Amino acid sequence: MTSAASEWPLANTQHGMLVAFGEFLKQHGLIDGLMRVPVPQRTRQFAPQTKLVEFLAGIMSGIEHLEDLNDGPRPLVKDPVVAQAWGQIGFAHYSSVSRTLETCTDETVAAVEQAINEFSRPFVASVVHDLLRRGEALVYDFDLTGQAVSSTSTTYPGVAFGWMNDRIKLGYQLARVCLSPQPQERLWLAGFHHPGDTVSATCLRELVHAAEAQTQVRPRRRTELVQQRIEAQQEVVTRTQRLVRQHAEKLDRLHQTQTTLIGKIYHTEALQKGAIPSGKMAHLKTQVAGWRKRLPRLATQITTAARVLAKHQARLHEQEAALVELQAWHAQLEADNRTNPDPPTYVEARMDAGFVSGEHLTWLLEMGYCPNTKAPNDRTTTALRTRLSTKTRWVPVGANADMTAWGNYFLHGCPFPLTVALERFKVGRAYKYATLIYYRDEGVFPTLPVWFHHYNERQTIEAGNKEMKGTFFVQHLMSRSPAGIRLQVLFTGLAANAVRGCVPWLQRCAPKPTPKLTRALNSPKQLVHVAANAAALVQRTLCGTALQFAPDSPFPGVTLFLAGVPAFQLALGFNQPYEFASG
């Protein structure tokens, strides 16, 4: 390779780092996986799978709109070197890519997701293994972010009005979960697309199940908590069964009384037809009149008793069904534990208040997670403020924040004791309040300052959402087909992970990194918007591929030796490029 500007030949690509991205993904088997995805479209000049690969390459080059593939400042379609690095003979016109996205089906999306999972699995396993080896917690961050479209649009499928960016907008909601191994570090695990009126709490279970599927790790299920609910439910069922018996016996007595009265009336009226003394006749008539007067009241009592009995029977049926459901849930969690002999000691679910309800907290706790979240509404905060007194001890946790905490607090809808902390923030001369919620099995809790700062580290996922929008433009929907929209979500998460995941490999591929390159490697946005759109010369030999950035690029003279990264390696053998032989 050459480094002197006077000796520099013409660059043969305008997307230097994108070539490296393609080599990385190709050598790890992702491109081959995408080329096997079923797409119900005939091959003309380019296979439909090629257009999916092109779509991913475009996202990793930072295109803002699909037409940028052709009409952007550095058209990807006109760069055959990039296409070759991504294992293709060339790239198609963006309109052809658009038609392919419209043709994709649920089967296509599922196959793409499977290919991405196979690519991601060793990287996720490496991070998880490292955390568990060091005895550190697994922390999952959950979030819901809006994808707004024009309020007058009628062509986006499944849109709905919902709360997005502090106002009501038309669009979609994107539910995501990431693993946060360290502050400011994240590994996206899954994302789901929903109509705009979807709320966070309804997405929690699918995100938890997706996180477990990706990491292949799950906490010990707390079957003892489910057993507590079973025992409580059995007591409820027993009480209702007693009520049902009591009301059934009462109804039987009323029916028996009614039958007896009718019999007496019939018998007495039969006696009146015979020859009896006038005094006795008058007495019998008085008795019959009293019995007949009592019958309507008795019928009303029977109707009321039957209605009350039916109500208790219906309640008993619901309670018995709930008990059966709890017993099945207990059996399922026990089965989970039998196949999970060495669970991690602590797995945290960190989320904002939108994901929280009594029902979902109960489910999380029984699933073995330790929630770290905020109270779902102001009622909890208001209730806690009534506990304050002049003797309350406030602990400073930040420059403008204090906290005080209570244990064994029961939130509405959750039968298990939680630890809660009241936060106060001074704004002007007044205070504003909020409530944090936490749970740990062993009862050993962090100090309030540690808790405060650890919860606020969930800004990691919020920063990730901003990166999705500012680096990969996920908010600009590049297709109006359901499958195309879901593919954009999948490819955006993949791109964010891959750009970060390939950094150690790129560092080893650059024998003489410059300060500018080092800064770029620490900034996904610079890698995508600057390095992946920088002119370079790519040369291929029998030994491998070498890439040198142009003298007038942001990284003049930087050379990357892109030697083969094996598609499958042990966890401790990642990012080891082969060395070029000299001579």
Which stretches of residues belong to each language-model region?
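Anion-binding and metal-coordination hotspots
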Residues: 1-12, 32-583
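Conserved oxyanion/phosphate-binding beta-strand-loop segments in alpha/beta enzyme cores
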Residues: 11-34
